């Protein structure tokens, strides 16, 4: 069992969903990114998704896009992220996932990417713009290092496509709550319950719900049989930090 799955199963055994904050590398700025990540780790994060800044983040809403733009202008890049993770390996209790777009990973080279990610204590990757049909080379490189390539599914993902993902997926399944870009939303979209149920019928892996979560009450809007094993929150956290509040305060809402 991949460590990411272990983290989620342990949280569920304790009677709660696992908590997965998303933090763009270099946000709020280079000086405070790592202390903020450690604060998330110390205050209940089971897994932390680190966003790799990219110039054309097609799946991200304005909050994450702006965080990415600022990080890039501050000189944050994939090579530096991996190097700093290697320097801090073993300090973070949470599972670590890199979430980013294909181009920087492709330019870095899959074999070296997987090796350097393993040296940095990374347990999984999420690549929103990587088609399943083209995922083989990256999946094989990551698998050699014991790193999961986490599948994404959404309202438009067919049962056949889910079955393909289920054959090779590891760690957890990222369930996209709505089609479109990331960002806070007031209510959980009506189709989420259907998507969750369909995914639950196909996958044995834990299901993590993301894209738009703002507060714990949104999970309670879902029927019990459609609630996720883990909650991913990105834009809500970035907005909270941008307003000058602490990661500790944000995590306290979800406990």
Curated annotation (Swiss-Prot):
InterPro entries tied to this protein: Aldolase_TIM, RibuloseP-bd_barrel, Trp_synthase_alpha_AS, Trp_synthase_suA
Pathway involvement of the protein, from the record: Amino-acid biosynthesis; L-tryptophan biosynthesis; L-tryptophan from chorismate: step 5/5
Active-site positions on this chain: 49, 60
GO molecular function per UniProt: tryptophan synthase activity
Entry superkingdom: Bacteria
Keywords: Amino-acid biosynthesis, Aromatic amino acid biosynthesis, Lyase, Tryptophan biosynthesis
Gene3D superfamilies: Aldolase class I
Reactions catalysed, as given in the entry: (1S,2R)-1-C-(indol-3-yl)glycerol 3-phosphate + L-serine = D-glyceraldehyde 3-phosphate + L-tryptophan + H2O
TM stretches of this protein: none
Record SUPFAM superfamilies: Ribulose-phoshate binding barrel
Cysteines paired by S-S bonds: none
EC nos: 4.2.1.20
Keyword match Lyase: yes
Signal peptide interval: none
Matching PROSITE patterns: TRP_SYNTHASE_ALPHA
Presence of the UniProt keyword Nucleus in the record: no
HAMAP family in the cross-refs: Trp_synth_alpha
Subunit: Tetramer of two alpha and two beta chains.
Protein's UniProt name: Tryptophan synthase alpha chain
